[in-house]
Amino acid sequence: MKTEKRYLVPGDYMADPAVHVFDGKLYIYPSHDWESGIAENDNGDHFNMKDYHVYSMDDVMNGEIKDHGVVLSTEDIPWAGRQLWDCDVVCKDGKYYMYFPLKDQNDIFRIGVAVSDKPYGPFIPEANPMKGSYSIDPAVWDDGDGNYYIYFGGLWGGQLQRYRNNKALESAILPEGEEEAIPSRVARLSEDMMEFAEEPRAVVILDEDGKPLTAGDTERRFFEASWMHKYNGKYYFSYSTGDTHLLCYATGDNPYGPFTYQGVILTPVVGWTTHHAIVEFKGKWYLFHHDCVPSEGKTWLRSLKVCELQYDADGRIITIEGKDE
């Protein structure tokens, strides 16, 4: 399906959006790309982001978007090394908790927490990362019953292949072919929102026969960019396939899964990465994502986009064409 799309921040490079509705207003929490001069490589060193802005709006497709400025930077974070990648924010009891991936001073990705009294920040970081945290792409789900869940993980530069059973390996292992694909992770958060309340679990995605997706199934298996939303009582776990550049989704009956693969949300865009948020606002559903058209294909200089997202009568997401030409 081709659909009208809008670039939201044409004057800057913003990507990897997390999007939520707080107090009737829509807030966007993107990563902030810039020209760092670092050569492109499979570890993603060229994605050398160092701060976050927050944006808000009342009218998605036509309204003004407000930039609330820098709300957190690596200079504010005591344990910071480099590469402040994509974050997410959740509200509990009037406090706003930002979860962010950042390499520590040993060049290992950890997940940190920063807190604000306002959805637009500024966010004050904790002195240390979450205990036992690793990898990238935190996405937080408020299940509406007092429980909050954090999804995380990403391959290659995201370092997920360096871990098994939540323990670091001596060397990274990437499965191949018919071996089971490396899954995303999920854990319930502690009451104070600062730690895992339990050991992170695998987010298993099943094929049509009820079998876990394999590493060789690169157009369906998880790579990075976890997101969760709920529609008509079903849990929709969506994600990027990374090196095949698709946004896909799977559905399940609870936040832990397992989830059964359903299809493609967004076909490849211009640029290597694809990352997204799905949110309902004022009776319509939207897909926030990014591409590299304004930077003429520089994959480390991405631009924030949005379009409407639709479901068919059976609750399947109607696939959106990533390229507009």
UniProtKB/Swiss-Prot annotation:
Q: Which InterPro entries match?
A: Glyco_hydro_43, Glyco_hydro_beta-prop_sf, Glycosyl_Hydrlase_43_Enz
Question: What is the protein name given in its UniProt record?
Answer: Xylosidase/arabinosidase
For this protein, the Enzyme Commission number is 3.2.1.37, 3.2.1.55
Recall the GO molecular function terms of this protein's record: alpha-L-arabinofuranosidase activity; xylan 1,4-beta-xylosidase activity
Q: Which GO terms describe its biological process?
A: xylan catabolic process
Gene3D superfamilies associated with the record: Glycosyl hydrolase domain, family 43
**Stated family:** Belongs to the glycosyl hydrolase 43 family.
Q: Does the keyword Hydrolase apply?
A: yes
Induction trigger:
By xylan.
Q: Which domain of life is it from?
A: Bacteria
Q: Which Pfam families match?
A: Glyco_hydro_43
Q: Is Acetylation set as a keyword in this record? A: no
Q: Which key words tag this protein in UniProt? A: Carbohydrate metabolism, Glycosidase, Hydrolase, Multifunctional enzyme, Polysaccharide degradation, Xylan degradation
Species of origin reads Bacteroides ovatus
Identify which residues the record assigns to the active site: 16 (proton acceptor), 224 (proton donor)
| Coiled coil, from the record | none
Which reaction(s) does the protein catalyse, per the Swiss-Prot or TrEMBL entry?
Hydrolysis of (1->4)-beta-D-xylans, to remove successive D-xylose residues from the non-reducing termini; Hydrolysis of terminal non-reducing alpha-L-arabinofuranoside residues in alpha-L-arabinosides
Point out the annotated site residues (description: Important for catalytic activity, responsible for pKa modulation of the active site Glu and correct orientation of both the proton donor and substrate).
Answer: 137
